[in-house]
Amino acid sequence: MKITYVGLIKVCFLVFLLLCATVLLNISWRQRDSSQSLQHCNSTCSAKYLETKLKEAHLTGRHKKWETYRLDAKPTSATGQGHQHFAKEPLQIKDLFIAVKTTKKYHGNRLNLLMQTWISRAKEQTFIFTDWEDQELRQKAGDQMVNTNCSAVHTRQALCCKMAVEYDKFVLSDKKWFCHLDDDNYLNLHALLDLLSTFSHSTDVYVGRPSLDHPVETVDRMKGDGSGSLKFWFATGGAGFCISRGLALKMSPWASMGNFISTAEKVRLPDDCTIGYIIEGMLDVKMQHSNLFHSHLEHLQRLPTESLLKQVTLSYGGPDNKWNVVRVNGAFSLAEDPTR
């Protein structure tokens, strides 16, 4: 019995030695294969090898399929403030929904200017939202004039009422971009298309110019119990702003079918501030700040003349500051062309 037990131990020891030898041999062969692969990689990944293959590709024409995919392409500044974006999609005027907010007393002096200038180049894309059924304007604009039936008084409620109608009409359209303007804005359509073409309408885009140099802080009446505060940026409506369709649809719970008015009442903010509240405060989407939009609150004479063609919107001073206009050299004097 003892002899059998000792013999079994010897057999097990021999089997163990054989297994160890097999493992060592496998490790040795794998290291050899790895060394050969590394040598092959070093030879085919060298700069000299790649340059040779690149020349061969140019000679055979095989590179043409990929020549538009430039890894070293430099993005261009889109918003005019250092923000950089790659071009996403071709854009045409027909893809825009341009909403112009106005009121009865400005149908004559302000709207006539717009109808004679930039609106004439985008008649089918521009909708005029007003508070009075003006038959003369109806004849000029047709169905592009929208009587909101909102109050003509310049109050938060009246402004939000018009913005609510603007939003709902855009959502019902098939347009890719919603752009809001005031009736004292001049719109450079080419510059607007250049700007929006750098984004995708299916992504979350909210672009405009803030009127303040800091975010607004207000009581958070929507998310919490009203004891906390919320900070957010908003694009001033006086300079104009644009929202992508993808983002506009996400705003629906707080903006569609009259909800915009109730949201504005809860947070007690005007129309453009409420837009920023919904986008930044509720949806947590950051506004794209752009200095290509301009309102009458700016010192417009400081804009360099050579940069005017690059600006998306321009404006002019009101009765209290009628000389606040851009500097433009031309055949007409300031008295003849007061809004420039």
Swiss-Prot record:
Q: What is its main location?
A: Golgi
- Judged by the first EC level, this protein's enzyme class is transferase
Topological domains annotated Cytoplasmic: 1-4
Short name of any one Pfam family annotated for the protein: Fringe
Q: Which domain of life is it from?
A: Eukaryota
Q: Where in the cell is it found?
A: Golgi apparatus membrane
Cofactor(s) listed: Mn(2+)
Topological domains annotated Lumenal = 26-340
Catalytic machinery residues: D272
Residues bearing carbohydrate: N42, N149
Q: What is this protein called?
A: Beta-1,3-N-acetylglucosaminyltransferase radical fringe
The source organism is Xenopus laevis
Lineage of origin: Eukaryota, Metazoa, Chordata, Craniata, Vertebrata
